[in-house]
């Protein structure tokens, strides 16, 4: 086989493996977010948004209970080989989450919002973080 033929074959394999990893990571993220959302529901929260996006960032899960609006960042890993998932929440990520939360609050308060706000208003906004390693969930409330 020619050298260029082998190079093309390697490029195709690399593209396929990249696409396969992307699908696996997407499925892992959805599984983790489903697990976290179910945890909040069991704890008596209403989920009012999932994967809410704006130019300032994305909010994985937004929940509500007893006057507290909770924004949860979800991190998922297949295993712990690459460290603690919570370490992936950098100061820059926290800033993006805070800015996205401000945009979310502004949108929920607008008349054109597609999000149904909870009855009453929140007195507090809390930021939680969730890590799912394999199938194990670890929650940290009020982390930043």
Give, region by region, the residue ranges found by the protein language model.
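Domain-level recognition of nuclease-like catalytic cores that cleave nucleotide substrates
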Residues: 1-3, 108-144
């Amino acid at each position: 086989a020619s050298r260029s033929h082998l190079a093309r074959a390697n490029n195709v394999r690399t593209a396929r493996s990249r696409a396969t990893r992307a699908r696996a990571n997407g499925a892992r993220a959805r599984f983790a977010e489903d697990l976290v959302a179910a945890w909040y529901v069991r704890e008596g929260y209403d989920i009012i948004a999932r994967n809410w996006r704006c130019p300032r960032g994305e909010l994985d899960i937004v929940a509500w209970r007893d006057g507290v609006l909770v924004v949860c960042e979800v991190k998922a890993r297949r295993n712990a080989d690459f460290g603690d998932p919570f370490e992936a929440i950098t100061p820059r990520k926290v800033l993006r989450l805070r800015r996205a939360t401000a945009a979310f609050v502004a949108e929920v308060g607008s008349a054109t919002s597609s999000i149904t706000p909870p009855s009453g208003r929140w007195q507090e906004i809390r930021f939680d973080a969730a890590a799912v390693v394999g199938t194990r969930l670890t929650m940290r409330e009020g982390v930043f």
